[in-house]
């Protein structure tokens, strides 16, 4: 119920304040500080998390990262299950998502703007193209991440989510999607900011060539936090890690 959700949100907020007091005044003991991130399916968000965690003694912390549905990213940060969420805005979804963020008492912080890319297997028939148009993709399965039976197009992680595709396959995780790219010659439309260290070198991001009916949309990637909240030390380090990775790895991607 709405009352139950609101109670859970305030309970977590109070507990978070309690944890902050314990962290500040406790000496020794076995208390573990907690930090969580919820994100759309971005390998760069996971890589930034890995780089951040390596700076800490993991025996003193309880870390969590959740690659999940867009609605869950928003819900997790709103209920303080995660301190930071990572998602994108576009001309298509901006108004709807900002309304959802506002109602959840969250705010969006800009990280980077990028165009959409076609992400596919290195041995895909279109792998040698300089750019790929919508018509060239027609004969191949379009892959997308599941967002739930009742989700709207605005929660999709891919651009052109309202288009009619002759063949579509949905996946719930990145590993399955990569397998589908190989097994079905499938593709997805994504930011093009891919962490090869995590996804492997068998996949390519090729510029998507938009046309009048199927325009390439700017994707504004950012992170969300609770409104008027102050990021913890770990939260600030994670955001810094995100910014550093994006600065170092978007020259070739854009």
Please describe what each predicted stretch is:
Residues 9, 50-55, 71-115, 120:
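Short beta-strand-centered segments that line the small-molecule binding cleft or hinge
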Residues 119-127, 220-231:
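A bilobed periplasmic-binding-protein/Venus flytrap-type ligand-binding module shared by bacterial periplasmic
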Residues 1-17:
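Basic, amphipathic "hinge/linker" alpha-helix immediately C-terminal to the N-terminal HTH DNA-binding motif
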Residues 69, 78-83, 147-204:
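Hydrophobic hinge/microswitch elements
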């Amino acid at each position: 119920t709405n009352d139950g959700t609101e109670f859970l949100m305030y309970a977590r907020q109070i507990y978070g304040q309690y944890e902050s007091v314990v962290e500040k005044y406790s000496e020794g003991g076995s208390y573990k500080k907690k930090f969580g991130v919820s994100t759309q399916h971005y390998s760069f968000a996971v890589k930034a998390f890995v780089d951040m965690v390596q700076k800490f003694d993991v025996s003193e912390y309880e870390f969590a990262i959740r690659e999940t549905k867009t609605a869950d990213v928003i819900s997790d940060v709103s209920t303080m299950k995660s301190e930071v969420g990572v998602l994108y805005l576009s001309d298509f979804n901006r108004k709807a998502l900002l309304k959802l963020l506002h109602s959840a008492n969250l705010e969006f912080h800009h990280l980077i703007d990028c165009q959409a890319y076609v992400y596919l297997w290195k041995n895909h028939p279109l792998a040698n193209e300089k750019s790929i148009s919508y018509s060239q993709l027609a004969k191949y399965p379009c892959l997308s991440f599941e967002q739930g039976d009742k989700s709207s197009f605005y929660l999709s992680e891919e651009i052109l989510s309202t288009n009619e595709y002759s063949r579509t396959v949905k996946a719930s995780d990145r590993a399955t999607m990569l397998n589908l790219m190989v097994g079905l010659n499938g593709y997805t439309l994504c930011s093009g900011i891919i962490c090869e260290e995590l996804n492997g070198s068998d996949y390519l991001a090729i510029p998507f060539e938009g046309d009048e009916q199927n325009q390439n949309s700017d994707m504004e990637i950012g992170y969300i936090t609770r409104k008027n909240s102050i990021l913890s030390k770990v939260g600030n380090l994670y955001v810094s890690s995100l910014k550093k990775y994006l600065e170092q790895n978007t020259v070739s991607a854009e």
